[in-house]
């Protein structure tokens, strides 16, 4: 039987691309700002 090869980890996603991580740096805040301007429903992963 074949195995699923992609196992996403929630903790890593949160640490890398969560909202609070984005807000820490200037570039991260720019990402949030751009997504707000575009009208994204989800600004960050978590």
Curated annotation (Swiss-Prot):
Keywords: Ribonucleoprotein, Ribosomal protein. GO terms for biological process: translation. InterPro entries: Ribosomal_bL34. GO terms for cellular component: ribonucleoprotein complex; ribosome. One of its GO terms (molecular function) is structural constituent of ribosome. Signal peptide: none annotated. The keyword Ribosomal protein applies. Belongs to the bacterial ribosomal protein bL34 family. This is Large ribosomal subunit protein bL34. The gene is rpmH.
């Amino acid at each position: 039987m074949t195995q699923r090869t992609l196992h996403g980890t929630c903790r890593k996603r949160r640490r890398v691309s969560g909202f609070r991580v984005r807000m820490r740096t200037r570039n991260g805040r720019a990402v949030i700002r751009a997504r707000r301007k575009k009208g994204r429903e989800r600004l960050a992963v978590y």
